[in-house]
Amino acid sequence: MNREEQFGILESLLFAAGDAGLSTEQLTEVMEITHIEALNLLELLSERYNGNADRGLILLELAGTFQLATKKAHAEYLRKLVEVPSNTVLSQASLETLAIIAYRQPVTRMEVDEVRGVQTDGPIRTLVAKGLVTDKGRVDGAGRAKLYVTTSEFLDAFGLNSLEDLPKLADPEADDPDQNEMDLFFDRFNQSKEQEEE
C-alpha cells in the first residue's frame, strides 16, 4: 500500500480508538508495519495536522498513546456548540450507554463497548457534550483509558437525588443482567418524561 493509503488507515484507526488512544504496538500489529514505520507515519501525520492552519484536528501523544483532538484555537466554537440548547432527545445508543455508565461507574469506554457489543465513542461524546457524563481520572496501566461517571446534571435530568435512587436491579441472576439494567433505566426515564409533560 502507498503512503496516502497508510495515512487514511491511520486516521481511521485513530478515530475509532477515540479517547483511549492508539499505541505504536497496536498500530504495528493492525497495519502490519514495523515500529520505525509506525513512528514515521505518526510524525508525518502530526506535521500535516499541527502545521496546517486549515485543519481542525491535531495529533496528541498522551501516556504512550496517540489520539486525535480538536485545536485549542477552535475552543470558542466548540463551547458555543455545546451551549446551544438542543431539543433533540437522546438516541437509543446514547440511553443504553448512559444506563451502563450510571450503574457501573466509574467505567472505561472499552468496558461500555464490551457490554453493548459495539463502539460507543459517539454516544459518549454526546453524553459528555450534554453534560450528563464526564471523565474522572484514568485507569492505571497500559493505555491509561479515561474513567467515565455521571454528573449532577444527570441526576437533575432524571429526577434523582443521588445514585442510590437509581432503580434497583430486581434479579442479578437474570439471563441478561445488562439488559435488565437498561430496561429499568428506560422505565425510569420514561416516567420522568411523562411527569414533565403533565
Curated annotation (Swiss-Prot):
UniProt entry tagged with the keyword Cell cycle: yes
InterPro entries referenced in this protein's UniProt entry, alphabetically: ScpB_csome_segregation (IPR005234), WH-like_DNA-bd_sf (IPR036388), WH_DNA-bd_sf (IPR036390)
GO-annotated biological processes: cell division; chromosome separation; DNA replication
Pfam family, one: SMC_ScpB
Keyword Cytoplasm assigned: yes
Domain of life assignment: Bacteria
Any single Gene Ontology cellular-component annotation: cytoplasm
Gene3D superfamilies assigned: Winged helix-like DNA-binding domain superfamily/Winged helix DNA-binding domain (1.10.10.10)
PANTHER family: SEGREGATION AND CONDENSATION PROTEIN B
Role this protein plays: Participates in chromosomal partition during cell division. May act via the formation of a condensin-like complex containing Smc and ScpA that pull DNA away from mid-cell into both cell halves.
Name of the protein this chain belongs to: Segregation and condensation protein B
Organism: Listeria welshimeri serovar 6b (strain ATCC 35897 / DSM 20650 / CCUG 15529 / CIP 8149 / NCTC 11857 / SLCC 5334 / V8)
Name of encoding gene: scpB
